[in-house]
Curated annotation (Swiss-Prot):
Protein name: Deoxyuridine 5'-triphosphate nucleotidohydrolase
Function description: This enzyme is involved in nucleotide metabolism: it produces dUMP, the immediate precursor of thymidine nucleotides and it decreases the intracellular concentration of dUTP so that uracil cannot be incorporated into DNA.
Pathway note: Pyrimidine metabolism; dUMP biosynthesis; dUMP from dCTP (dUTP route): step 2/2
Single GO MF descriptor: magnesium ion binding
Catalytic reactions of this protein: dUTP + H2O = dUMP + diphosphate + H(+)
Species in which this protein is naturally found: Nitrosomonas eutropha (strain DSM 101675 / C91 / Nm57)
Gene field: dut
Length: 149
């Protein structure tokens, strides 16, 4: 397990410290660190503070902010940027872009779980400019060209 430095901006998080729900959980829940119930109207996007900052400090890691499946499926609440990327050298508070793609207003409660944070390995590449690629079986075919019977 990788140890990560974390800052708590909201004292309420001491009672519900971010953690993994089960031993097999890939992500830990991020909570809405808001002071009062906040409505997210259909089509609206709001930036919601998570109350935490992390510092991964190693360019071999990044964190991704992902939507919670229940909020998206049941209420239409997904991430406005689809996936949030937290670079290893970012030290500011993590903000969650919540987009209501549903057709009814959603009431977001203080400290409600709104997203998941997953830490992932990163490989930084160096690029070699070429005129042509070595031929592959797939070539330039894309957009549904694979997996056909």
């Amino acid at each position: 397990m990788k140890q990560v430095d974390i800052k708590l901006f909201d004292p309420r998080l001491k009672d519900c410290f971010p953690g993994y729900a089960t031993p097999g959980s890939a992500g830990l829940d991020l909570r809405a660190c808001i002071d009062e119930r906040t409505e997210i109207h259909p089509g609206e996007t709001l930036l919601i503070p998570s109350g935490i900052a992390i510092h991964l400090a190693n360019p071999g890691f990044a964190a991704v902010v992902l939507p919670r499946s229940g909020l998206g499926h049941k209420h239409g609440i997904v991430l406005g940027n689809l996936v949030g990327l937290i670079d290893s050298d970012y030290q500011g508070q993590i903000l969650v872009s919540c987009w209501n793609r549903g057709q009814t207003t959603f009431a977001l409660e203080p400290l409600e779980r709104i997203a998941q944070l997953v830490i992932v390995p990163v490989i930084q590449a160096s690029f070699n400019v070429v005129n042509d690629f070595q031929h592959s079986q797939r070539g330039e075919r894309g957009f549904g060209s694979t997996g056909k019977c």
